[in-house]
Design a protein with these regions (language model features):
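Adenylate-forming
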Residues: 11-13, 37, 41-44, 48, ...
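Conserved S/T- and glycine-rich ATP-binding loop of Class I adenylate-forming
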Residues: 59, 76, 173, 179-182
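Conserved pre-ATP/AMP-binding loop-to-beta segment of ANL
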Residues: 16-18, 141, 151-178, 185
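AMP-dependent adenylate-forming
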Residues: 7-33, 145-149
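Conserved AMP-binding/adenylate-forming
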Residues: 47-96
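AMP-binding/adenylate-forming domain of the ANL superfamily
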Residues: 1-21, 39-44, 58, 68
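Structural core segment of the AMP-binding/adenylate-forming
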Residues: 75-154
Length: 185
């Protein structure tokens, strides 16, 4: 009857070691040391907990492939929540089709994403998605949050609480992954 938390294992070790690197389409590089990552994960996890997220609750990310999504996922896993993601190029109906099945409590959204050198603004679609996800109690926006009801990512990584991981059973789910049908499975 083992109980563990994968985040404890992933974030254990030398705090100065570089463990997360993000490179955007233009080649700009951002990186986190284990200590920086641990701090950001702890801060986001504390905000999730304060928002009412409990072990087994679902949180979702409708965002590009950026380091903030990794931090979001690690924070959720650290408190026993289950993570799901959707590509930013999904229209609101596609996001609702997927996330409506899992009733997420929190939603992480990228304010913009870049594809093929072109920037797309997602902020105008957030309310459309929320209209179909009535169980969402909070929205966190990577980048500029244009709606005062939404939290900015920078405000969610501003705290420095210690990381406290919830140990869960070995069979506790961590992710819910959706296929677009292109996997052949």
């Amino acid at each position: 009857d083992a109980h563990l938390n994968i985040v404890e294992t992933l974030l254990a070790g030398e705090p100065e070691a570089e463990v997360l690197v993000g490179i955007d389409e233009a080649g700009a590089r951002r990186s986190w040391t284990r200590g920086e990552l641990r701090s950001d994960v702890a801060s986001v996890a504390a905000h999730m907990h304060r928002a009412g997220v409990e072990p087994g609750d679902r949180v979702a990310a409708w965002a590009p492939n950026v380091p903030e999504v990794v931090i979001w996922a690690l924070a959720a896993l650290s408190i026993g929540a289950v993570v799901s993601t959707a590509s930013p190029d999904f229209a609101p109906a596609g996001v609702i089709d997927r996330f409506g099945q899992i009733t997420p409590r929190l939603l992480l959204v990228g304010s913009t994403y870049t594809y093929g050198g072109q920037q797309f603004d997602m902020r105008g679609s957030i309310d459309d998605v929320l209209a179909g996800l009535p169980d969402v109690i909070g929205v966190v926006v990577i980048g500029e949050a244009s709606d005062p009801r939404h939290h900015s990512w920078s405000s969610w990584v501003a705290d420095l609480p210690p990381l406290e991981c919830v140990r869960v059973g070995f069979d506790h789910p961590g992710f819910i992954l959706f296929s677009s049908g292109t996997t052949g499975a």
